[in-house]
From Swiss-Prot:
It is an enzyme of class 4 (lyase). One of its GO terms (molecular function) is identical protein binding. Belongs to the group II decarboxylase family. It comes from Mus musculus (Mouse). Residues 1-22 are annotated as: Disordered. This is Glutamate decarboxylase 1. The lineage of its organism: Eukaryota, Metazoa, Chordata, Craniata, Vertebrata. The keyword rRNA-binding does not apply. It comes from the Eukaryota. 4-aminobutanoate binds at Q189, L190, S191, R566. Homodimer. Residues 1-12 have a biased composition (Low complexity). The modification N6-(pyridoxal phosphate)lysine is found at K404. The gene is Gad1. Keywords: Decarboxylase, Lyase, Neurotransmitter biosynthesis, Phosphoprotein, Pyridoxal phosphate.
Length: 593
């Protein structure tokens, strides 16, 4: 990690009243956020941009205007210096208003403002409750209950327009019956948390409503993506300046890109002539790797039989000797080894494959090395933990999902490629209506032809904005904290009779895998009958957990092992007290099993 990482700015008003706001430095004043902080209780409101040319007096006046909200809940204002617009929250009868009454309808500005202010209030209330530990993680209902309708919440589509009042009810109920994945006690998935800066970025992204295929229609976002991808490649450790990459719809697609790039690198004729024109190719990945590698093998015409699984040790790491043996076996049988996937942070155990040893084997047999760091890539931001990915700089490609350990809102996944031009060559189709070569700007910034998609969502802005807000050091601290919580959990349960660890030793990542042993099974010798009973414990506790809605954690089997809990921590809001609560809740729900 570069030593030039900027330090977080310090505030001379650290002890100030949190309900008041002093002016921030000029670079922050560009955003309405300078006024948003004036009231904590009503929360943030999206208010547009403030022009950089505003005088200090003008900015002070705007902040004062926002402070009025503390004494009047009806005042919600947005002032842009170029038009002086000001909106007041008014009692509005939405039962007689419809979508056709909103902009671009004539005279639709006021109705639009009132409607959006109502939506923002719904969102802010949801955000506030998400961080309130007395709020449930979920209000669980079975599918048939939601399909049948819940207290006026009807999922069926209507032929005729419904009122904006009903639309607002639908907005509230959609959040009410969903899962609060940002709740500090939600541990069910690798992607958790609700970053406020990222949320602001996603709101702005949706408002801009553009596409990432050309600089022509997304100039700022395209440049942000290039700058961010370059920074990520540098953090991986690639010294060349001509690498490549793109943001994709998720880690599974990023992994698919890596296989496509490898195939095109060694057999470019496959693009025009198909798989019939190339030898019988095989791919290698660990038995603990993400299932997306096999999915990509099926989708790209290799076939799942030609995705060869490599044995792992008891910690879930690839055994290099088995990899080399299977490469030689495939060659002897007439297959052509093409690609090896090493995982940096497996989904279940959180294991890091020995990349250096795998890279040696790939170089020896001239194979493409991909590192799936979707889950573990965030550790590259930590000087304390990045050694776990030692050798990643030797990879030909890397998958890295900022929407996991870095807490970026879904979706945000990058495929990084060491060699420039492969993605373009592999996927380029030169659609004349998008990628005209005679545009008035440098068309090398039209990145859309590198993608297998045409339309591509803007995933970069929320990530870029978070990086600006936190700095590299902020992400480092966030990731270190999550790993410290995993260590805390492991130390708390490793020697207790109610719990049994799935594998020996401290976890490498935030994955802590364990069985809860109910009273009825403690001291019972291992046997098929005991394993069968133990297999049913985690699903029963999880069902009770979801019914109560107090917390969520995942479970699964692995190989011949009975169902166990897989605790993962990626939510910066989680604390030791939340870990304590989870353990107590598992004990409470499982004590009578």
């Amino acid at each position: 990690m570069a030593s030039s990482t900027p330090s977080p700015a310090t505030s001379s008003n650290a002890g100030a009243d949190p309900n008041t706001t002093n002016l921030r430095p000029t670079t922050y004043d560009t955003w309405c956020g300078v006024a948003h902080g004036c009231t904590r209780k009503l929360g943030l409101k999206i208010c547009g941009f403030l022009q950089r040319t505003n005088s200090l007096e003008e900015k002070s006046r705007l902040v004062s205007a926002f402070r009025e909200r503390q004494s009047s809940k009806n005042l919600l204002s947005c002032e842009n210096s170029d038009q002086g617009a000001r909106f007041r929250r008014t009692e509005t009868d939405f039962s007689n208003l419809f979508a056709q009454d909103l902009l671009p309808a004539k005279n639709g500005e006021e109705q639009t403002a009132q409607f959006l202010l109502e939506v923002v209030d719904i969102l802010l209330n949801y955000v506030r409750k998400t961080f309130d530990r007395s709020t449930k993680v979920l209000d669980f209902h079975h599918p048939h209950q939601l399909l049948e309708g819940m207290e006026g919440f009807n999922l069926e589509l209507s032929d005729h327009p419904e009122s904006l009042e009903q639309i607002l009810v639908d907005c509230r109920d959609t959040l009410k019956y969903g899962v609060r994945t940002g709740h500090p006690r939600f541990f069910n998935q690798l992607s958790t948390g609700l970053d406020i800066i990222g949320l602001a970025g996603e709101w702005l992204t949706s408002t801009a409503n553009t596409n990432m295929f050309t600089y022509e229609i997304a100039p700022v976002f395209v440049l942000m993506e290039q700058i961010t991808l370059k920074k990520m490649r540098e953090i991986v450790g690639w010294s060349n300046k001509d690498g490549d990459g793109i943001f994709s719809p998720g880690g599974a697609i990023s992994n698919m890109y890596s296989i496509m790039a490898a195939r095109y690198k060694y057999f470019p004729e496959v693009k025009t002539k198909g798989m019939a024109a190339v030898p019988k190719l095989v791919l290698f990945t660990s038995e603990h790797s993400h299932y997306s590698i096999k999915k990509a093998g099926a989708a790209l015409g290799f076939g799942t039989d030609n995705v060869i699984l490599i044995k792992c040790n008891e910690r879930g790491k690839i055994i290099p000797a088995d990899l080399e043996a299977k490469i030689l076996d495939a060659k002897q049988k007439g297959y052509v080894p093409l690609y090896v996937n090493a995982t940096a942070g497996t989904t279940v155990y959180g294991a890091f494959d020995p990349i250096q040893e795998i890279a040696d084997i790939c170089e020896k047999y001239n194979l493409w090395l991909h590192v799936d760091a979707a889950w573990g890539g965030g550790l590259l931001m930590s000087r304390k933990h990045r050694h776990k990915l030692s050798g990643i700089e030797r990879a030909n490609s890397v998958t890295w999902n900022p929407h996991k350990m870095m807490g970026v809102l879904l979706q945000c996944s990058a495929i990084l490629v060491k060699e420039k031009g492969i993605l373009q060559g592999c996927n380029q189709m030169c659609a004349g209506y998008l990628f005209q070569p005679d545009k008035q700007y440098d068309v090398s910034y039209d990145t859309g032809d590198k993608a297998i998609q045409c339309g591509r969502h803007v995933d970069i802005f929320k990530f870029w904005l978070m990086w600006k807000a936190k700095g590299t050091v902020g992400f480092e601290n966030q990731i270190n904290k999550c790993l410290e919580l995993a260590d805390y959990l492991y130390a708390k349960i490793k020697n207790r009779e109610e719990f049994e660890m799935v594998f020996d030793g401290e976890p490498e990542h935030t994955n802590v895998c364990f069985w809860y042993i109910p009273q009825s099974l403690r001291g019972v010798p291992d046997s098929p009958e005991r394993r069968e009973k133990l297999h049913r414990v985690a699903p029963k506790i999880k069902a009770l957990m979801m019914e109560s809605g107090t917390t969520m954690v995942g479970y699964q089997p692995q190989g011949d092992k009975a169902n166990f809990f897989r605790m993962v921590i990626s939510n910066p809001a989680a604390t030791q007290s939340d870990i304590d609560f989870l353990i107590e809740e598992i004990e409470r729900l499982g004590q009578d099993l």
